[in-house]
Curated annotation (Swiss-Prot):
The lineage of its organism: Bacteria, Bacillati, Bacillota, Clostridia, Eubacteriales. CDD domains: AdoMet_MTases. Specifically methylates the N7 position of a guanine in 16S rRNA. GO terms for cellular component: cytosol. This is Ribosomal RNA small subunit methyltransferase G. S-adenosyl-L-methionine binds at G78, F83, A129, E130, R148. The keyword Metal-binding does not apply. It comes from Desulfitobacterium hafniense (strain Y51).
Amino acid sequence: MLPEHQELLGRLTRQRLNIELSGDQIEKFSIYADRLVEWNEKVNLTSITEPEEIILKHFVDSLALLSLVQGKRLADIGTGAGFPGIPLKILLPEVEVYLVDSLAKRLDFLETVIKELKLTKVQTVHARAEDFARDPHYRETFDCVTSRAVARLPVLLEYAVPLLKKGGYFLAAKGSQAQEEVMESKKALTVLGAEIKDIKLFNLGAEAEHRAIILVEKTSSTPPAYPRKAGTPGKKPLV
């Protein structure tokens, strides 16, 4: 990123999120943005390629979850180009982060970024979300799960809740339809052992879509039957 874009990143995180980025953190975001644009020419990572939009719609949007992250072990499911997992990792070096995606080429990009930014305690996982959540090494071991994936909330809940320890939180980044998706999720919440704790609303800017973060707390152990086999939650959501 150019110096003016670095300045914009620092200003927006300070003004919109009350987050003061260090020079080292801004440099990491700058490298991340540059690599995202470079790799996007050969791997479909994002439709957002202008520096100002990367800053606002990827970096600032991801960091809106920062104050809600709890615990020392986080999984970002359907991470894609690393959002929100990598931005959160840059600001939370002590948290162990797992970046989960089903497309190997995206994970190749993330491995490159992780190495160049010298990030530690971060792992990429090549897996479908359903398979990852059924793995006994990962199931019910996370304090926090995040996702900006496009699936609707009942589907995301079946991916995320089985990964959480009791008392852990799923942070689902959503658009203006968040309340509607919550209403669709009553059955999924009951079946999976979770409840909605809060819906945090925010706006990235005058022309940007209203955003929401849905906070879901795991209240009891998830039955062994969930998540169902890969593909089933999307085709037959718990509604």
